[in-house]
């Protein structure tokens, strides 16, 4: 008795949820976004549903012809049957798109715009280059470091010949 009740409950639930959902006050239909969707992908060559859901009368007669011998079908009918089930063929899926051109164009545009912003900042935002970047100042700084004998063991002053006043060879 308990098993019969459980089976009838499961059966009622399966029937009621397959077509529509029953709410407290009426019948709620299944929304379209909850149903399986059609996607053409190389990784999943057989989608869950057919591409064309609502068949025209010609397509319905073609589906009836499909149940018979395929030798009786012409090539155009076979292609039409294929297009009912699939939107694209593998050749069409594998065909490259020209989307890369717009991506590269967008990247080059933003790189160019960034370059213009950097040039504008150098001219109008930043001040003059400090005097410490001048080659004359750098030469004086180098001579001062050598005179102070900075890091004489392994570093800078170790490569300077103090007797001949030139770099060691």
UniProtKB/Swiss-Prot annotation:
Cystine connections: none
Transmembrane segments: 99-124
Pathway connected to this protein: Energy metabolism; oxidative phosphorylation
Keywords, ordered alphabetically: Membrane, Mitochondrion, Mitochondrion inner membrane, Transit peptide, Transmembrane, Transmembrane helix
GO cellular component: mitochondrial inner membrane; respiratory chain complex IV
Membrane association type: Single-pass membrane protein
Mitochondrial intermembrane side: 125-169
Highest taxon above the source species: Eukaryota
Membrane topology (Mitochondrial matrix): 23-98
Locations listed in the record: Mitochondrion inner membrane
Pfam families, sorted: COX4 (PF02936)
Transit sequence range: 1-22
Biological process per Gene Ontology, one example term: mitochondrial electron transport, cytochrome c to oxygen
Family, similarity comment: Belongs to the cytochrome c oxidase IV family.
PANTHER family associated with the record: CYTOCHROME C OXIDASE SUBUNIT 4 ISOFORM 1, MITOCHONDRIAL, CYTOCHROME C OXIDASE SUBUNIT IV
Record function comment: Component of the cytochrome c oxidase, the last enzyme in the mitochondrial electron transport chain which drives oxidative phosphorylation. The respiratory chain contains 3 multisubunit complexes succinate dehydrogenase (complex II, CII), ubiquinol-cytochrome c oxidoreductase (cytochrome b-c1 complex, complex III, CIII) and cytochrome c oxidase (complex IV, CIV), that cooperate to transfer electrons derived from NADH and succinate to molecular oxygen, creating an electrochemical gradient over the inner membrane that drives transmembrane transport and the ATP synthase.
Subunit structure: Component of the cytochrome c oxidase (complex IV, CIV), a multisubunit enzyme composed of 14 subunits. The complex is composed of a catalytic core of 3 subunits MT-CO1, MT-CO2 and MT-CO3, encoded in the mitochondrial DNA, and 11 supernumerary subunits COX4I, COX5A, COX5B, COX6A, COX6B, COX6C, COX7A, COX7B, COX7C, COX8 and NDUFA4, which are encoded in the nuclear genome.
Name of the molecule in the record: Cytochrome c oxidase subunit 4 isoform 1, mitochondrial
Provenance organism: Thunnus obesus
């Amino acid at each position: 008795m308990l098993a019969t009740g459980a089976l009838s409950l499961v059966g009622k639930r399966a029937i009621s949820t397959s077509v529509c959902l029953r709410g407290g006050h009426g019948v709620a239909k299944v929304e379209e976004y909850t149903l399986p969707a059609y996607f053409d992908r190389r990784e999943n060559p057989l989608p869950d549903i057919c591409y064309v859901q609502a068949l025209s009368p010609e397509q319905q007669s073609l589906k009836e012809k499909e149940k018979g011998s395929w030798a009786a079908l012409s090539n155009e009918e076979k292609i039409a049957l294929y297009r009912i089930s699939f939107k694209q063929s593998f050749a069409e899926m594998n065909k490259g798109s020209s989307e890369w051109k717009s991506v590269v164009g967008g990247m080059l545009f933003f790189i160019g715009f960034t370059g213009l912003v950097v040039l504008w900042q150098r001219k109008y935002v930043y001040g003059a280059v400090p005097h410490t970047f001048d080659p004359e100042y750098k030469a004086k700084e180098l001579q001062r470091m050598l005179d102070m004998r900075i890091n004489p063991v392994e570093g800078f002053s170790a490569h300077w010949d103090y007797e001949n006043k030139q770099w060691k060879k």
